[in-house]
Amino acid sequence: MTDYKNTLNLPDTGFPMRGDLAKREPGMLERWYEQDLYGIICQARKGKKTFILHDGPPYANGSIHIGHSVNKILKDIIIKSKGLMGYDSPYVPGWDCHGLPIELKVEQLIGKPGEKVSAAEFRTACRRYAAEQVEGQKKDFIRLGVLGDWEHPYLTMNFATEANIIRALGKIIANGHLHKGAKPVHWCIDCRSALAEAEVEYYDRTSPSIDVAFAADDVRAVAAKFGAADFAGQISLIIWTTTPWTLPANRAIAVHPDFDYQLVEVEGQGYILAADLVDSVMARAGITCWTVLGSAKGSALELLRFRHPFMGFDVPAILGQHVTLDAGTGAVHTAPGHGPDDYVIGQQYGLEVANPVGPDGCYLPGTLPALDGLQVFKANDVVINLLCDSGALLHVEKLQHSYPHCWRHKTSIIFRATPQWFVSMDQRGLRKQSLAEIKDVQWIPGWGQARIETMVANRPDWCISRQRTWGVPMALFVHNETEALHPRTIELMESVAQRVEQDGIQAWWDLDPAEILGDDAAHYHKVPDTLDVWFDSGSTHSSIVAVRPEFEGHAPDMYLEGSDQHRGWFMSSLMISTAMHGKAPYRQVLTHGFTVDGQGRKMSKSVGNVVSPQQVMDKLGADILRLWVASTDYTGEMAVSDEILKRSADAYRRIRNTARFLLANLNGFDPARHSVSPEQMVVLDRWAVGRAQAAQAEIVAAYDSYDFHNVVQRMMQFCSVEMGSFYLDIIKDRQYTTKADSIARRSCQTALYHIIEALVRWMAPIMSFTADEIWGFMPGERAQYVFTEEWYDGLFGLDAAQPLNDAYWQILLQVRSETNKVIEQARADKRIGGSLEARVTLYAEPDLAASLRELGDELYFTLLTSNAVVADYADAGDDAVQCEGLKGLKIALAKAEGEKCPRCWHYETDIGQHADHPEICGRCVTNVAGPGEERKFV
């Protein structure tokens, strides 16, 4: 028997079937960095319109986790897709390098500054530790396939950046937004430092809930307000609190001016309570019998005085709109040193901002003998005993409630008034301007706008000073007596910045004030505080983007971080940019959700559900991780597990197999010599290129709107359905059996070439390693890397005006689908083996029949049968199957006549009719020894 294998155009490519990504990707990375791929991209994009995605700096501490991977991959997808859109989109990764977590790590290694090591030695150790952490994280980020200027990242501890952070503060001071005050701020006892809003987390805590009686200083005056001048007993205003330890700092009691208050008598004692809360207070105090003596508005109680239960002084009743009837008594214990609302109202009444608590959370000496030196949370019971002894405790119980905790230590924090520096939200209109700027930013998803608007509207002044060692100094000089800033503050800060630019932040602590103050050094001293680390990262639009040459002075277009950054980096950046320049630092803000396991649970080592990006890359490869990120809707929680990653790996294989089929069938094709013009191409091939054109339009639009999961879905639909289930199946016969250099085959290869040119670009932002691998196997002259290209512009489609247009092929897809159902049933019934053993008759209504006859004797190629006949619908016999999915069509199937051709596998009746080739069919004889068959449609 003659072997006709050498007469077939069998697929052949060096592109492997298996990705082996975990093994192959590291070698590709090595090549990328040896050849300076990022530099090549920058050179290719030079002079194009810019798109700047500014990297929010991760903290330089610890290994990267799956959330870091999501963040960096999303950024990389955007950067690469913007490049394909024709943008110059430089990416400069950064790290946040100052702050408490690094201090704590270094303390564990070498001890606290001022003990075993000097502050200068401690800072040097912090800098060294942060640099080590950056290098470790950098390797993992690079392994993800993220392209950027990894050789020159920005670090907030770079000398020039530290100097620019000081300059940013100088600009804010020049614009009048800084002030100093002894305001209550979030204070962590363990950190011994103020905390930013973004460093506070809320957890449930059980606290003592107490009702306390403040006895009236002038009973007659108070009783008269309620029309009960004859009442002779003691009268007390009852407050409610869950922080008994703050009572030593009480300086007033706030009531609402518009609420009704009642004076009620209980066993000869008079209690003042909000009328709406009398029943609930009496119920929890176990009091069943009382008499209402009179009522008065809260406004009538203003400035009446009441005795502190154990501190030996009296305090006024004051009016406050913040008082509510949600819980308590309607009278609010007011300690201006321990609460923001208390502080604000205290300023209105000129109250003392008392702060009897030290930085360690213990009462200062001289507070009260029973409390001096006691830690505040341990003092609650002592305070309650003091209240019992004075007869002022009406009721006590345990209450579980949400309470602020330190994000680092997970321990309860306190409000504590200390002299701090603040960026004011209102003294120069920063809040109002920020709210206006928010409206000009595109927030993705849209709910982000309302979220940050609420935060800005309600946030207090920003405490930017910290009492830490490892941080950027505030670089301020204040008067020894008045604490006023030096009149040449801006000039002096620039002088300090220049020194820091040369020698780093240590230059500030080494600075002798006389060097720049001259004679004024006798009257001014250096402020020892450092800046909140959120000021470091929040000023990078100025300290980094505005000065890096690759950004060419352009402002950032996009910030992209996790949804927790509305109150973190997005907020601090907005505050600083608006305070400096009167405008937001970004045009778009995109947020992604947190990663959870397959059951929607937060990842936890104790639960054992943590997915390590390093392990995923070592097992499956970075492209699988990248494909998972892209295919997940990032606007909500992002679920990841072994099973979910397995599904991503399956999707990857389908896309890879499509690419491999295209490459294998482009064997021997040179686009410069073999391309067929659209007018000469087989109609089905033009249709396939048109489907790629339609897919590309949707994919590019999805990339542009950052809908990456829709990119993946459309790519999968194109590869699996439009190509894999239809076109690629149909063309195998023509591709393999026609003459190698025939129009029929070259038309098909031309289509495959256009499709792979488009597909590799669609893949590049997401499956970057695989796209680069494909690029290396594609025919024709091309640039070194796909990453320097733009979207493929060589696609074209069918003319909608011609009969065999897209709509026509959609009908044919339906006919093929219905035919496949009949064939599958026949195979199940053992009537045939494969579809080429079948001969089908399509009984169709007149319009459909006319459409099917357009393909002439090429119709059967679309159905993958050996023969297909179109007949009138009315002539269908009982053996014809009515199609459910396509009305007006019945299909009858019979076994194909003739013998199986060993070359094309079709069943034909003309085998043996050619003396030189007696074993093959007439069509194959034409392709082997004759002029070759012609194809017009299929």
Curated annotation (Swiss-Prot):
Zn(2+) binds at C901, C904, C921, C924. Its cofactor is Zn(2+). InterPro entries: aa-tRNA-synth_I_CS (IPR001412), aa-tRNA-synth_Ia (IPR002300), Anticodon_Ile_BEm (IPR033708), Ile-tRNA-ligase (IPR002301), Ile-tRNA-ligase_type1 (IPR023585), Ile-tRNA_ligase (IPR050081), M/V/L/I-tRNA-synth_anticd-bd (IPR013155), Rossmann-like_a/b/a_fold (IPR014729). CDD domains: Anticodon_Ia_Ile_BEm, IleRS_core. It is found in: Cytoplasm. Catalyzes the attachment of isoleucine to tRNA(Ile). As IleRS can inadvertently accommodate and process structurally similar amino acids such as valine, to avoid such errors it has two additional distinct tRNA(Ile)-dependent editing activities. One activity is designated as 'pretransfer' editing and involves the hydrolysis of activated Val-AMP. The other activity is designated 'posttransfer' editing and involves deacylation of mischarged Val-tRNA(Ile). This is Isoleucine--tRNA ligase. It comes from Sodalis glossinidius (strain morsitans). PROSITE patterns: AA_TRNA_LIGASE_I.
